[in-house]
């Protein structure tokens, strides 16, 4: 399956993300970094070019492992001093354990049934799961051209993704965790919603 051009280069990836998020681009990473204490261990699912690590977590001595289907991104992460693994997270396999298991802007890849991957994250987390997911998306635009552009630009090599979350559908999905949810809040000018879910036990 053809990979979107933005997943072929960290520079292109970042240019598109800056265009999408504008002045909120940097703050979306800071919001997640602020949830992770120094010297914690982190597993980041669908980590992309791992900018969260290189710009925010490396300086906090966080033990970071990024998982992604894109070998180029994983190689770049390893060169930057993190640990990385190339893997297809759609396979039903246990995730590496860590204090914090997180995913930013990638849960939609697992639609129409995203609960199993969240369950695997909960099973791997010693402290908390952090999920940040876009709830305002190009693919839900009323313009067919913009919607198509959103699907094409967000294919990491697993096929075009037509399904996306709204705030309501994300809330509904994660409501099954009830009192395990420590908090939820919007970031990036309301474009993404963050859920912090406590580990079991």
Model-assigned labels for residue ranges:
Residues 132-176, 182-185:
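C-terminal alpha-helical "lid/dimerization" subdomain adjacent to the S-adenosyl-L-methionine
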Residues 102:
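A conserved beta-strand element that flanks and buttresses the S-adenosyl-L-methionine
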Residues 110-121:
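A short, conserved alpha-helix within the catalytic core of class I
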Residues 40-48:
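Conserved class I S-adenosyl-L-methionine
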Residues 7-26:
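Class I SAM-dependent methyltransferase Rossmann-like catalytic core
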Residues 106:
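Hydrophobic adenine-recognition pocket in adenosine-nucleotide-binding enzymes
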């Amino acid at each position: 399956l053809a990979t979107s051009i933005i997943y072929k280069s960290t520079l292109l990836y970042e240019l598109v993300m800056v265009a999408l998020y504008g002045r909120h681009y940097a703050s979306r990473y800071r919001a997640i970094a602020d949830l992770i204490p120094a010297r914690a261990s982190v597993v980041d699912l669908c980590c992309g070019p791992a900018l969260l690590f290189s710009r925010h977590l490396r300086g906090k001595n966080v033990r970071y492992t990024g998982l992604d289907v894109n070998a180029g991104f994983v190689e770049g992460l390893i060169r930057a001093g993190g640990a990385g693994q190339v893997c297809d997270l759609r396979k039903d396999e246990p995730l590496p354990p860590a204090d914090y298991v997180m995913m930013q802007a990638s849960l939609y890849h697992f639609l129409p049934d995203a609960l199993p991957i969240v369950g695997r994250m909960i099973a791997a987390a010693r402290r908390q799961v952090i999920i940040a997911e876009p709830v305002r998306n190009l693919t839900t635009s009323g313009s067919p051209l913009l919607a198509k552009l959103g699907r094409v630009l967000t294919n990491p090599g697993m096929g075009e993704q037509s399904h996306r979350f709204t705030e309501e559908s994300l809330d509904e999905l994660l409501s099954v965790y009830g009192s395990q949810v420590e908090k939820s809040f919007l970031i990036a000018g309301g474009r993404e919603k963050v859920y912090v879910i406590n580990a079991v036990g």
